[in-house]
């Protein structure tokens, strides 16, 4: 049974990784893979509790999906009001090297509150108004990808993988930020410093202060755009605060935030005749935004997480964890390898697999284990979980296809895979390894 489940997962994974070759949507493959693995487990596993275990796995998966749908809706709502133009319209520098640093910093902090893909889309579209030279724009876009992935790794709501780890209790918001902010910053600073030498130190041609034309209707004034941007970002940042205050899971906080934003924008719609008179298809209302939610991505997450859940329920991941404990037994090596692997395959199933392989350890149980120092790495907010969060997020920058941000930039700017491998991958690797070194120093010197 177990070899068959593993074979199905590997074959499905190959089809997902080769989506651009097979031209079969990865969401369809993920759904089929999940159904096939659970079917094998049901027919050959002889587990009398399979119905209960299936419902448990579906419940865990749906918690993450509800959170993602809420976050995606709020971000799209901000964009529909032109809220992000408030940021892009204030970029006026003409020096290319200064511009690169400015964009990297904005991306780093923006992706901590928004998802990496949305942040990358906004910043790459901005580049088209700022940089005319195609190859120079590729360099800028590559730095944006690195900054987006690194920025998403230190925030509990910055990336799908951090959301997963945070919602399952593997990490807490405060400790995640305290442990990973500096390593993630270093992982951006080093590549950006090197990449800035690739661009000519002269003024950019035809730099436009009006950076991003999002198609936002003129009837939405700058004050309203700023108001929606502030309220939307505060609503997203409210989620970890809500969890800390109430003890309820993050998806409940996201539901509260989305409900508040929905009511607020409905009141604005009702009171502003100019918005009511807009063409119905472009009205900035949640009911319209929800129609544009990326459902294939949601279905992909369902398929992947349920497939990994089947491997966990069947004991496959436990066996893998036992093998790693016996043959590797070093958290930096394990997490570092996972990070490099995440540049080739999707980091969502990688992190989900690790969460299944290594359940959060109880402090007392870890202290009483045969190797307490190693076991302590797997308690809540332990060293392994912070390493995994960092490596899975930042490691996706090593290849252009290693992250959603990279794939988006590749599609928008037609960045060549070989060009990125030759010009950017070593830069990303230098930042990745430097960040791991910072985590090691934090652990050794101050015990973080």
Placement of each model-derived feature along the sequence:
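Short, amphipathic, aromatic/basic-enriched membrane-interface segments that mark the entry/exit
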Residues: 1-3, 89-95, 216-228
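Hydrophobic transmembrane alpha-helices of multi-pass solute/ion transporters
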Residues: 5-77, 86-94, 251, 255-306, ...
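Hydrophobic alpha-helical transmembrane segments
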Residues: 6, 31-32, 65, 100-105, ...
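Hydrophobic core segments of alpha-helical transmembrane domains in multi-pass membrane transport
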Residues: 6-18, 33-42, 68-76, 107-108, ...
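Membrane-interfacial helix-loop connectors
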Residues: 37-47, 58-59, 110-147, 151, ...
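Alpha-helical transmembrane segments
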Residues: 59-70, 175-191, 246-259, 334, ...
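Transmembrane helical segments that form the transport core of multi-pass membrane transport proteins
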Residues: 81, 88, 99, 103, ...
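Juxtamembrane and boundary regions of transmembrane helices in multi-pass small-molecule transporters
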Residues: 133-138, 142, 154-155, 164-165, ...
């Amino acid at each position: 049974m177990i070899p068959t489940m593993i074979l199905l997962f590997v074959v499905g994974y190959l089809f997902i990784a080769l989506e651009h070759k097979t031209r079969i949507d990865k969401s369809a493959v993920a759904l089929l893979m999940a159904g096939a693995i659970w079917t094998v487990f049901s027919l050959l596993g002889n587990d009398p509790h399979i119905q209960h275990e299936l419902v448990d796995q579906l419940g865990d998966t749906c918690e993450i999906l509800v959170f993602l749908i809420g976050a995606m809706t709020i971000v799209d709502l901000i964009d529909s009001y032109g809220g992000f133009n408030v940021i892009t319209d204030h970029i006026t520098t003409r020096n290319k090297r200064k511009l690169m640093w400015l964009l990297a910093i904005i991306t780093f902090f923006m992706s901590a509150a928004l998802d990496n893909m949305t942040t990358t889309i906004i910043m790459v579209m901005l580049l088209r108004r700022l940089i005319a030279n195609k190859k120079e724009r590729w360099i800028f876009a590559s730095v944006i990808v690195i900054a987006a992935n690194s920025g998403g790794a230190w925030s509990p709501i910055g990336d799908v993988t951090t959301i997963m780890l945070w919602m399952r209790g593997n990490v807490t918001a405060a400790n995640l930020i305290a442990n990973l902010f500096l390593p993630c910053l270093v992982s951006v600073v080093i590549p950006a410093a090197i990449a800035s030498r690739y661009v000519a130190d002269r003024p950019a041609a035809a730099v436009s202060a009006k950076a991003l034309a999002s198609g936002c209707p003129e009837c939405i004034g700058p004050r309203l755009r700023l108001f929606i941007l502030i309220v939307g970002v505060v609503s997203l940042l409210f989620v970890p605060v809500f969890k800390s205050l109430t003890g309820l899971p993050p998806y409940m906080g996201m539901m509260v935030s989305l409900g508040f934003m929905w009511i607020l924008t409905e009141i604005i719609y009702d009171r502003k005749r100019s918005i009511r008179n807009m063409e119905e298809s472009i009205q900035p209302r949640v009911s319209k935004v929800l129609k544009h939610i990326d459902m294939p991505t949601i279905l992909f997450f369902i398929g992947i997480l349920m497939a990994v859940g089947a491997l966990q329920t069947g004991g496959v991941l436990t066996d893998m964890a036992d093998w790693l404990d016996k043959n590797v037994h070093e958290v930096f090596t394990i997490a570092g390898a996972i990070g490099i692997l995440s540049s080739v395959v999707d980091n969502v199933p990688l992190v989900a697999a690790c969460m299944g392989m290594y359940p959060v350890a109880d402090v007392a149980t870890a202290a009483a284990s045969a190797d307490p120092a190693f076991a302590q790495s797997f308690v809540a907010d332990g060293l392994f979980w912070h390493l995994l969060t960092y490596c899975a997020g930042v490691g996706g920058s090593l290849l252009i296809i290693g992250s959603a941000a990279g794939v988006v930039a590749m599609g928008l700017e037609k960045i060549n895979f070989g060009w990125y491998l030759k010009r950017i991958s070593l830069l990303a690797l230098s930042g990745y390894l430097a960040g791991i070194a910072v985590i090691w120093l934090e652990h050794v010197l101050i015990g973080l």
